[in-house]
């Protein structure tokens, strides 16, 4: 089956073009990048550099059966795992720009993209995704990053008390597809909040990294890079920073997502000129 014949099996909204990645990350180390504020802190930059170096080496090697099939990023919610995977795709896209090759694509796959009620359809969707990876998602010969987000909802451990018969079948198709992946053209990234729920045979096929809660300095740096908050006065920014330090110490703010919500409430309070009635939500 050609990729074009199977294209209807994968929603176009799940294919993120290099052009869209550029909108998020071009100039990501400056304040004008919409996605850059989530990629701060030396730990995140070190992770990005390592993932990029490994994937780039395998893509340039030309060997379709590289030793590293991809990466598994695990950690608490809101710590930037998905953003890190998208940034990896952008960095690879920058390194493999060529007049002779189409721009790379990022395929975003979650449980909703895979799960289907009819027996065998979910397995067929997994096969279709890897078929696209071999031939190109939107153009022949296109390189790609396959991002399986919250992968524990798709490929559950066979020994789990929550696993169903169809989980075994999906896992089996995924095992085979991973082993057949052309690592000179595609890289897989899995993200998970609960790696203990993922089948061990899947975990063993990937390099595993922990993306943990950022430190206080990183959270402050992230807040300071949000463009909308530049409008705050020096006194307001100092107050926000002091409040953030207190929120981190009492555990109210832990993740990047928490910090973004914290900044949003401060911004709203500036508009209202009083404290917002919005409730704080902890992941």
Which residues are covered by each model-predicted region?
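Pre-Walker A (pre-P-loop) alpha-helix and adjacent loop at the N terminus of AAA/AAA+ ATPase modules
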Residues: 17-70
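Conserved AAA+ ATPase small/helical "lid" subdomain
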Residues: 1-4, 232-283
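Short regulatory helix/loop adjacent to the ATP-binding pocket of P-loop NTPases
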Residues: 194-207
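Substrate-gripping "pore-loop 1 plus following alpha2 helix"
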Residues: 122-129, 159-183, 212-214
């Amino acid at each position: 089956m050609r990729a074009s014949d199977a294209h209807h099996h994968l929603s176009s909204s799940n294919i993120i073009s290099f052009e869209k990645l550029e909108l998020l990350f071009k100039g990501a180390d400056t304040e004008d990048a919409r996605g850059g504020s989530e990629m701060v802190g030396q730990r995140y930059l070190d992770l990005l550099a390592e993932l990029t170096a490994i994937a780039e080496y395998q893509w340039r090697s030309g060997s379709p059966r590289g030793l590293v099939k991809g990466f598994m990023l695990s950690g608490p919610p809101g710590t930037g795992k998905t953003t890190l995977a998208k940034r990896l795709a952008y960095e690879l896209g920058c390194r493999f720009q060529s007049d002779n090759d189409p721009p790379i694509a990022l395929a975003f796959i979650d449980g909703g993209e895979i799960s289907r009620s009819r027996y065998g359809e979910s397995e067929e969707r997994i096969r279709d995704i890897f078929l696209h990876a071999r031939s190109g998602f939107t153009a022949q010969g296109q390189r790609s990053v396959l991002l399986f987000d919250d992968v524990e909802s798709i490929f559950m451990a066979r020994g789990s008390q929550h696993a169903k018969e169809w989980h075994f079948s999906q896992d089996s198709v995924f095992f085979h597809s991973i082993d057949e992946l052309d690592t000179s053209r595609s890289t897989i990234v899995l993200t998970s909040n609960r790696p203990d729920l993922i089948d061990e045979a899947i975990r063993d096929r990937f390099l595993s990294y922990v993306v943990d809660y950022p430190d206080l300095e990183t959270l402050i740096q992230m807040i300071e890079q949000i463009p909308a908050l530049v409008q705050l006065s020096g006194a307001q920014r100092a107050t926000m920073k002091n409040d953030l330090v207190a929120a981190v110490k009492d555990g109210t703010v832990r993740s990047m997502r928490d910090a973004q919500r914290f900044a949003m409430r401060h911004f709203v309070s500036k508009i209202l000129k009083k404290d917002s009635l919005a409730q704080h939500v902890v992941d």
